[in-house]
């Protein structure tokens, strides 16, 4: 890798990485970036849930602590690309049984990376890729000239184009249009629907005075009630520690850890967090 002095670095560890391995890698990166740079840690299995500020890192390492990472999902690669600064670099390692070089190269290219280099080592599939020097959706000025060009010769006469969409005004009689009755434009089926359609308040009144759809509802209330009943209820377990190293101190905590900034504590010790600490920084 290039010189990391003064760079903002993010390293992503796999769940199998031990505390001493994480600490050694963090110390190595901090020595390389010096005080002018910064080093942050995240966990691979929480990559989809954590917030990574856009265009914040010069270099991102993934799968370089202990074992290589599993296959990076397309959404994860897109998230890492957005977190890199323009011209930033991604260096990742995947297990050999995750996919082949061609598939990884294609995934990185589709994720928005350029200068993709993929190789196979003895223990892992390694890749280096760069983010373009521009942001997606960035605006750039275009040099446009609207000056009239000088004509070399006499202007040719305009071609006579046939007017195919003209209507002669004498084809219609305004009096005939005004005398037409609107009901004459409806057939028997249209009139039957107009007379049998229920009013907006023609629904039955159920318990509690709330209107409900009729058995043969045609006003749309039955569809609205069915759609409301089909809405899913979001349930799921509360987020838990992924790395299990939160109690060791900031050197072992992820950048999005709610315990960040607090002193180390004993395993199993009760620690109370405020509502502000439980909310992720936007």
Swiss-Prot record:
<feature type="binding site">
    <location>
        <position position="243"/>
    </location>
    <ligand>
        <name>[4Fe-4S] cluster</name>
    </ligand>
</feature>
<feature type="binding site">
    <location>
        <position position="203"/>
    </location>
    <ligand>
        <name>[2Fe-2S] cluster</name>
    </ligand>
</feature>
<comment type="similarity">
    <text>Belongs to the anamorsin family.</text>
</comment>
<keyword id="KW-0408">Iron</keyword>
<dbReference type="GO" id="GO:0005737">
    <property type="term" value="C:cytoplasm"/>
</dbReference>
<feature type="binding site">
    <location>
        <position position="214"/>
    </location>
    <ligand>
        <name>[2Fe-2S] cluster</name>
    </ligand>
</feature>
<feature type="region of interest" description="Fe-S binding site B">
    <location>
        <begin position="243"/>
        <end position="257"/>
    </location>
</feature>
<keyword id="KW-0496">Mitochondrion</keyword>
<dbReference type="GO" id="GO:0051539">
    <property type="term" value="F:4 iron, 4 sulfur cluster binding"/>
</dbReference>
<feature type="binding site">
    <location>
        <position position="257"/>
    </location>
    <ligand>
        <name>[4Fe-4S] cluster</name>
    </ligand>
</feature>
<dbReference type="Pfam" id="PF05093">
    <property type="entry name" value="CIAPIN1"/>
</dbReference>
<feature type="region of interest" description="Linker">
    <location>
        <begin position="141"/>
        <end position="192"/>
    </location>
</feature>
<feature type="short sequence motif" description="Cx2C motif 2">
    <location>
        <begin position="254"/>
        <end position="257"/>
    </location>
</feature>
<keyword id="KW-0001">2Fe-2S</keyword>
<protein>
    <recommendedName>
        <fullName>Anamorsin homolog</fullName>
    </recommendedName>
</protein>
<dbReference type="InterPro" id="IPR029063">
    <property type="entry name" value="SAM-dependent_MTases_sf"/>
</dbReference>
<dbReference type="GO" id="GO:0051537">
    <property type="term" value="F:2 iron, 2 sulfur cluster binding"/>
</dbReference>
<feature type="short sequence motif" description="Cx2C motif 1">
    <location>
        <begin position="243"/>
        <end position="246"/>
    </location>
</feature>
<comment type="function">
    <text>Component of the cytosolic iron-sulfur (Fe-S) protein assembly (CIA) machinery. Required for the maturation of extramitochondrial Fe-S proteins. Part of an electron transfer chain functioning in an early step of cytosolic Fe-S biogenesis, facilitating the de novo assembly of a [4Fe-4S] cluster on the cytosolic Fe-S scaffold complex. Electrons are transferred from NADPH via a FAD- and FMN-containing diflavin oxidoreductase.</text>
</comment>
<dbReference type="GO" id="GO:0046872">
    <property type="term" value="F:metal ion binding"/>
</dbReference>
<dbReference type="InterPro" id="IPR007785">
    <property type="entry name" value="Anamorsin"/>
</dbReference>
<keyword id="KW-0004">4Fe-4S</keyword>
<dbReference type="Pfam" id="PF20922">
    <property type="entry name" value="Anamorsin_N"/>
</dbReference>
<keyword id="KW-0479">Metal-binding</keyword>
<dbReference type="GO" id="GO:0005758">
    <property type="term" value="C:mitochondrial intermembrane space"/>
</dbReference>
<dbReference type="GO" id="GO:0009055">
    <property type="term" value="F:electron transfer activity"/>
</dbReference>
<feature type="binding site">
    <location>
        <position position="246"/>
    </location>
    <ligand>
        <name>[4Fe-4S] cluster</name>
    </ligand>
</feature>
<keyword id="KW-0411">Iron-sulfur</keyword>
<feature type="region of interest" description="Fe-S binding site A">
    <location>
        <begin position="203"/>
        <end position="219"/>
    </location>
</feature>
<keyword id="KW-0963">Cytoplasm</keyword>
<comment type="subunit">
    <text>Monomer.</text>
</comment>
<dbReference type="InterPro" id="IPR046408">
    <property type="entry name" value="CIAPIN1"/>
</dbReference>
<feature type="binding site">
    <location>
        <position position="217"/>
    </location>
    <ligand>
        <name>[2Fe-2S] cluster</name>
    </ligand>
</feature>
<feature type="binding site">
    <location>
        <position position="254"/>
    </location>
    <ligand>
        <name>[4Fe-4S] cluster</name>
    </ligand>
</feature>
<feature type="region of interest" description="N-terminal SAM-like domain">
    <location>
        <begin position="1"/>
        <end position="140"/>
    </location>
</feature>
<dbReference type="GO" id="GO:0016226">
    <property type="term" value="P:iron-sulfur cluster assembly"/>
</dbReference>
<dbReference type="InterPro" id="IPR049011">
    <property type="entry name" value="Anamorsin_N_metazoan"/>
</dbReference>
<feature type="binding site">
    <location>
        <position position="219"/>
    </location>
    <ligand>
        <name>[2Fe-2S] cluster</name>
    </ligand>
</feature>
């Amino acid at each position: 890798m290039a010189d990391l002095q003064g760079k903002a670095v993010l390293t992503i560890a796999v769940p199998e990485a031990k505390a001493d391995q994480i600490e050694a890698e963090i110390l190595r990166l901090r020595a390389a970036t010096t005080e002018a740079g910064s080093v942050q840690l995240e966990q691979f299995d929480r990559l989809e849930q954590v917030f990574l500020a856009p265009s914040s890192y010069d270099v991102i390492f993934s799968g370089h602590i202990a074992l290589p990472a599993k296959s990076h999902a397309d959404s994860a690669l897109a998230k890492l690309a957005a977190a890199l600064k323009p011209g930033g670099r991604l260096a990742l390692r995947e297990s050999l049984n995750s996919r082949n070089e061609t598939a990884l190269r294609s995934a990185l290219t589709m994720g928005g990376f350029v200068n993709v280099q993929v190789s196979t080592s003895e223990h892992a599939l390694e890749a280096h890729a760069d983010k373009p020097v521009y942001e997606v959706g960035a605006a750039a000025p275009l040099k446009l000239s609207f000056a009239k060009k000088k004509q070399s010769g006499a202007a040719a006469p305009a071609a006579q184009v046939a007017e195919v969409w003209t209507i002669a005004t004498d084809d219609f009689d305004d009096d005939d249009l005004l005398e037409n009755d609107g009901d004459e434009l409806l057939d028997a089926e249209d009139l039957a629907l107009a007379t049998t359609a229920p009013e907006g308040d023609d629904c039955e009144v159920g318990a509690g005075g709330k209107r409900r759809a009729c058995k043969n509802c045609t006003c749309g209330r039955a569809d609205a009630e069915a759609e409301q009943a089909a809405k899913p209820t979001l349930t799921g377990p509360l987020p838990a520690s992924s790395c299990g190293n939160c109690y060791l101190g900031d050197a072992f905590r992820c950048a999005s850890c709610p315990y960040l900034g607090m002193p180390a504590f004993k395993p199993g010790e009760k620690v109370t967090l405020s509502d502000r600490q439980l909310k992720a920084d936007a």
